[in-house]
Amino acid sequence: MNPSVPKVMKRENNTHLLVSKEMNDTSLQLPSTTRSLSPKESNSNEDFNVDGNETTLQRISKDYLKPNIGLVLLTVSYFFNSAMVVSTKVLENDPDDIANDRQIKPLQILLVRMVITYIGTLIYMYINKSTISDVPFGKPEVRKWLVLRGCTGFFGVFGMYYSLMYLTISDAVLITFLAPSLTIFLSWVILRERFTKVEALGSLISLLGVVLIVRPSFLFGTPELTDSSSQIVESSDPKSRLIATLVGLWGVLGMSCVYIIIRYIGKRAHAIMSVSYFSLITAIVSFIGINTIPSMKFQIPHSKKQWILFGNLGVSGFIFQLLLTMGIQRERAGRGSLMTYTQLLYAVFWDVALYKHWPNIWSWIGMIIIISATLWVIRIRAANNETTAKDLTPIIDDEENSIPLTEFDLSDSK
């Protein structure tokens, strides 16, 4: 008999013993692993999760949040916009500052807000430099469009800030609801999109709503003088209200141009880059205006409340612009424009919460007219887009899918 055979058999027996021991150890651990599982959990692999809530959250995120992420971003952005608007209203209409000739003007508010916002954009861009290209000025081929976005953005925000001096928060915000109709008109002029009679009629009806907000004296007569507390909420002077409304309409034009430019740029520039140009250009223009316009005086905040309000302007403005740009880039124009109506809910809330002021009957009628006309136009336009082959391709993330503005002589130089 070969003497090596017992050694082999012994080695195999030892190996068998080791394997058996490991299996026994594993089997001893199995009850502790499965003991916490309920019958429902053990019979359903789909619903099983250690936390118990993750699957539900993932399903909600997949079915509702992700498909509508653009709408969510826009809704949240408009909340921060409302916080910024109400801070502006309080700063511009402080009765003590008005009585002592220390009223803070819109350009000063814009300067402070945009300086804070621009600093925030620089910090954000350099922290995320690995994911944001060409910091801090963006790609050379889109810089001229970013500059144009900043210039038109200034007119848009100045129109709103000026109108807040003489109109209620809800009235000033309501005027901006003309932006969707004006955007459609500008799309016809610049992008050569269709502009139907229905859309033209809807725009005219919206203007009727604006007239009810302005309430000119030749139509509504001279209003009775009200107490000083009411004057803080809104002016009773028809001339002041008319000028404020016209400046607000000029701001609406700027907003519409911003929307088209951002849609053209698409994702060729990071959202924060658009905010950066907007804040920088607005700060520069505001600084020049304060130092060249004789009636402008730079007022240093003299109370804790004013410092807090100025700080809120900068922080809320930064978040608003960032989320707004991200939302516009991710959502179709029709659905995205519907979210602007959340601003009205916020505005009425602030008017009531801060000033105990409900809109009067004419403002309510104007509100209903403007909203109804705009919704009507958007609905008709959406229906037409479904039946025509001339739709714009949604912007994804490259230059090929951008709206071809260049063929309309808007980019002469490079």
Swiss-Prot record:
Positions on the Cytoplasmic side per record topology: 88-106, 168-171, 221-241, 291-307, 379-414
Keyword field contains Membrane: yes
Annotated stretches, region: Disordered: 20-51
Transmembrane segments: 67-87, 107-127, 145-167, 172-191, 200-220, 242-262, 270-290, 308-328, 358-378
Membrane topology term: Multi-pass membrane protein
A Pfam family matched in the record: EamA
InterPro entries named in the record: EamA_dom (IPR000620)
Listed Polar residues bias regions: 25-51
Family the entry assigns: To yeast YPL264c.
Protein's UniProt name: Uncharacterized membrane protein YMR253C
Species of the source: Saccharomyces cerevisiae (strain ATCC 204508 / S288c)
